[in-house]
């Protein structure tokens, strides 16, 4: 006879594992922001602001006038840029009283932006990805005439150059230069501009004079710092001038790791922390099922397979012998399972070619039962965390889970005794809590140690399944 059960479904999932950014601005719609690192850094610099009601509105489209303001804020800094004004109307639809008149005038004079053939600028019009990238490339020093950003095929040249410069790094999906840019995409592209290397031209030939002068040829090269400069390394220590190093001397990026051991960037501005963020530019692949050594080899290639390996499980760095074993599995067509990878485990693989470093991180999702929230202490404890401490690679290294404090995770006050939740844990500290999907009074159609079928839906276990009772 089929038995009716109350089931807690610990579904295989990739939880939102973003390091808390204590120094970043808090927007009321933070949960809707996809490019959190970019928005945090760009807003901390004052390049893009939120609205008076506390919203950021990441999906609102960027206007042409607002884009000009962003460029001026990047090049001049927000304080200097805010003082810009227009003595005369730069375009027939941009009077001197227009909010963006000063920004538009400056960008037009610098050759960064242009209007339409009918003499208009259309400041309230939307801006395509290609058009915004063209402006950013201009800020980096790329010459429109030399690089072919003019004529019928200008957008192709811009898209190619922007991608080569890394201005679309971390974009979800492929870059669509025809689509209107959203506010958070603008932040992402501007953020990538901060990290991009500036350029200059040798043997530049210019024809014409004044506003009609046009460069027709020149040899482009990356801009380098003079030997001994103190600015090199504030974004990347490579001898080249990154945009942020040139225009935001108080902005500093340093290599770091997040709580789970993933390669990360720590950002500070004027010696104040903005936040620490996973460096997804180094992420090669990720899995939520079993990973074979041969899979890793295929993902990273033969060169990176010889890099020094660092291996973390739930924020715990594996000891030398364990790492040596895991490293031996990374070979062509090898079927040995990497670590404790499997259902319910997020395995991420990072490759840093500059430092010749390979990092593999496993993050388990645990099912837990909560105790009552302690209002006096503002803490939440757990009656049981299923499977925690049983992970073979870290069994001897695992720490007891500490109570979660309200200051760290605000949602804990909503839980009561016996609630089932999903946790991620790093070095004994709970980092994320998410309510588990619970199905009550339902019927199990089929059951095995690997999976079960409930109401026609098949669920795979993260651990070996057990059925209690007859």
Language model features with spans:
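Feature responds to low-complexity, polar/acidic, surface-exposed segments characteristic
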Residues: 2-36, 49-100, 110-130, 137-180, ...
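Extracytoplasmic, non-cytosolic globular domains
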Residues: 189-192
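Amphipathic, non-transmembrane alpha-helical segments in extracytoplasmic/periplasmic proteins
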Residues: 67-68, 129-136, 186, 343-345, ...
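Short, flexible, surface-exposed loop segments at domain boundaries
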Residues: 205, 210-470
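Predominantly the structural core of cysteine protease catalytic domains
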Residues: 179, 185-187
